[in-house]
UniProtKB/Swiss-Prot annotation:
EC main group: transferase
Catalytic reaction list: 4-CDP-2-C-methyl-D-erythritol + ATP = 4-CDP-2-C-methyl-D-erythritol 2-phosphate + ADP + H(+)
Organism expressing this protein natively: Cupriavidus taiwanensis (strain DSM 17343 / BCRC 17206 / CCUG 44338 / CIP 107171 / LMG 19424 / R1) (Ralstonia taiwanensis (strain LMG 19424))
Gene3D superfamilies hit by this protein: 3.30.230.10, GHMP kinase, C-terminal domain
Record InterPro entries: GHMP_kinase_C_dom, GHMP_kinase_C_sf, GHMP_kinase_N_dom, IspE, Ribosomal_Su5_D2-typ_SF, Ribsml_uS5_D2-typ_fold_subgr
Protein name as catalogued: 4-diphosphocytidyl-2-C-methyl-D-erythritol kinase
Amino acid sequence: MPSSHPLPPPELRDCPAPAKLNLFLHVTGRRADGYHTLQTVFQLVDWCDMLHFRRRDDGVVARVTEVPGVPAESDLVVRAARALQAATGTTFGAEIAIDKVLPMGGGIGGGSSDAATTLLALNHLWGLGLTRPELMRIGLTLGADVPVFVLGQNAFAQGIGEELTPVELPDSWFVIIHPKQHVPTAEIFSDECLTRDTPVSIIAVFAARTNKFDFGRNDLEPIATAKFGEVARALAWLKQHNQHARMTGSGACVFARFPDAKTAQQVLERLPPEWDGRCVRSLAHHPLAAFA
């Protein structure tokens, strides 16, 4: 229910929407409705889109920046704001600007993270007072990856990705490579060669491991690398520097962990010029965690 607390100032600027990495991703089955059941661990990192919000009193939700290839009406940010309106009956609206830096079709959750940041920021800006579980339920209607960003912690995920258990992960540095190739998620999941029967893992087994970054595999990786040559080449290059390099999500981004920022930066400096790369640090908590 909407909160009776005084409203904050009408504008929220520089609200981060962090990327995620899938440390592993196992496809364990397929439900009758066609959704795949998964197990994965989500790692948040400090590579972020930045969103800016201005409260409106007329109920209008308007995206005021262009996002190439994404019409405003289908943007998860706009849909998240309207889902929050529908769930609460608030009469407030918002103007939303997005500084988009996370690549689309990269497997790092950019659109889902933008939606979660919208839910968290507008929960605060509109004075709604919804709890984190309430926001997570709204987020799930927008996409299976949205709830983990609302949860705001690294997590072991099951089901279609919505059954979340927080996990402690060590402070880490990663190199992420985007091979400038868009990988359609639906195409990967619909491939007849996709492994769909990986045995179920137990969270305690993962949690007890000293090295949590060489656990399991990404079941989507063989499909994506067979279909998209640049993804395969980027992964092969990164494996020269860390044999446990792997793809995140359904691609196209690949990543590897390194012992410190200096080592990660040295690897990044050798990156072939045809790809984009980034040295990132792990996050233990979402920057907007206090908004729910």
